[in-house]
Amino acid sequence: MNPVTKQFQFGQSTVTLETGRIARQATGAVLVTMDDVSVLVTVVGAKSPAEGRDFFPLSVHYQEKTYAAGRIPGGFFKREGRPSEKETLTSRLIDRPIRPLFPEGFMNEVQVVCTVVSTNKKSDPDIAAMIGTSAALAISGIPFAGPIGAARVGFHPEIGYILNPTYEQLQSSSLDMVVAGTEDAVLMVESEADELTEDQMLGAVLFAHDEFQAVIRAVKELAAEAGKPAWDWKAPAENTVLVNAIKAELGEAISQAYTITIKQDRYNRLGELRDQAVALFAGEEEGKFPASEVKDVFGLLEYRTVRENIVNGKPRIDGRDTRTVRPLRIEVGVLGKTHGSALFTRGETQALVVATLGTARDAQLLDTLEGERKDAFMLHYNFPPFSVGECGRMGSPGRREIGHGRLARRGVAAMLPTQDEFPYTIRVVSEITESNGSSSMASVCGASLALMDAGVPVKAPVAGIAMGLVKEGEKFAVLTDILGDEDHLGDMDFKVAGTDKGVTALQMDIKINGITEEIMEIALGQALEARLNILGQMNQVIARPRAELSENAPTMLQMKIDSDKIRDVIGKGGATIRAICEETKASIDIEDDGSVKIYGETKEAAEAAKQRVLAITAEAEIGKIYVGKVERIVDFGAFVNILPGKDGLVHISQISDKRIDKVTDVLQEGQEVKVLVLDVDNRGRIKLSIKDVAAAEASGV
């Protein structure tokens, strides 16, 4: 196959799609170049599904090679290791809009690999990777209802929406949003914002959808010219005989089971009914069906039952209407020795959230393609199996936990004080102790509460809510505060976090085409109503940050020293600063501009360290009396140390009013004496007097 290249303009960027030159054994491969950012995207699809598989095994791997930025990896092995958090999050970002576009019943394994091979360090390669994924799938012949387009959107009050902003532009942007979708519909939104209105957020989504039509047109042109033949694959026909048989026998019982409001009781009853279905209809004899097929059809009936009830206006699974938030229980200060803690319970979803304050040294060091940087705010989300009443894997966080933690972080990050205002490192951990829908939004609420309990001066409380959608034909229902089952059986997962003034995070995943602007407006409106309700209840428990930090939190003192004095504080090989830290049990961070941050487990420890630093950096003041130590005696006087590293000369004539023949008649090395600073010359030499001390003290110096 000869290489095929397609070039198009995408906003201010020139994008080139090339196939047929690299990775030709993959089912589909495209090299995307977008303003000096190049990403190689490959797609491989298995020709047949594995025996007995009942799920679609799609995997997306986004990887950043350090050579792309002209760097060699750190560490002992000097090669890329496990995926970074950024790589994991981008893999999820690509997965989410493409997964719903594979046909129902398609069980062949598909693997997408996006490799960043060159970057200009000025913009995120994720949009190029998403464009490449769309193109590689479009030319592969694999059943896929694409192509998709993707765009990043920024917002500036004076400029308006910005298409695919650079890192530099994002610094002054009050929005960072990624949108992906097809020609007709938006499928995925991921964003963080600085209290933008619902209308501004919706406008950004629609702006992105209009702009990425250029991507979709270019991918279609590439597929027309270089696409492989479409696979001869047909979706398995629905077994209407089995569907009707199970519905006739158990349909009413399934419907009744979905009126049980307690999750575990409902699951137990549905499990019994599923077992009955298998016992009645599964087997190898004539007229029977495989057990796996019976279970699949039973699940299909569950899906249809719940959806029909909702769109026809019947009460939801737990008896609520479409706009009601589950009952809340909010507690703060629940863990005695932590810096800040909260227990947030919404129905059968519960998060125990803890905030911890640390020193500047506790900040996370991130090694990215753009270089190393520090992150002084971390939010970690843990989802243990006991939260859903199951046994399961324990260990390092999975992709879902990393993604949910990042969403919760986005929700509260805009409300945090700056490092200048509050120079602590902040770590928030959300332990999901019960889960039945929207645990990430419970984490947002719990994080806001825990931060205020810790005394972190957040700008405003933040709450989050998850919305759902069920759409059947022209009928639809937007659901507030969805349950786990409603998430699984619905058509949309729409999460909104924000303050009473505006949105701080919006995440949307849509499983169907045809989500209209009207539906998104209704969802945002209901989310605002629910968010204000939750904030009102949170404010009854704690409405503003505590006036003082927890007594368990480290004390932090700030000061500024002359940058020329930094080496004096650090000492030879770090000896001086190390001695101060060891002796006072405090830690000291010094910036190049002379900013000093001192952290101590107690106020006394921090103050002691501060006094030591002050003593080292202090300058001798003319007319001030010091208590010094005689360091060295010479014929013409004595050198007295009055400050760390600062000696002054007491001339023999300044020792006493009486005539002295030998200095050693009056002074000895190591002797403590009071001295008065007479003068400091332009070379820093200090002239001292002992004999004038008495007169100076008498005059009140």
UniProtKB/Swiss-Prot annotation:
Q: Which reaction(s) does its UniProt entry say it catalyses?
A: RNA(n+1) + phosphate = RNA(n) + a ribonucleoside 5'-diphosphate
Where in the numbering of this chain does the KH domain appear? 554-613
Any idea where this protein resides? Cytoplasm
Principal localization? cytoplasm
SMART domains attached to this UniProt entry? KH, S1
Q: Which cofactor does it need?
A: Mg(2+)
Domain S1 motif intervals: 623-691
Q: Which residues hold Mg(2+)?
A: D487, D493
Identify which top EC class this enzyme belongs to: transferase
CC terms in the record's Gene Ontology section? cytosol
- Known HAMAP family for this protein? PNPase
NCBIfam families xrefs: polynuc_phos, PRK11824.1
Name of the protein in its database record: Polyribonucleotide nucleotidyltransferase
Which source organism? Pseudomonas paraeruginosa (strain DSM 24068 / PA7) (Pseudomonas aeruginosa (strain PA7))
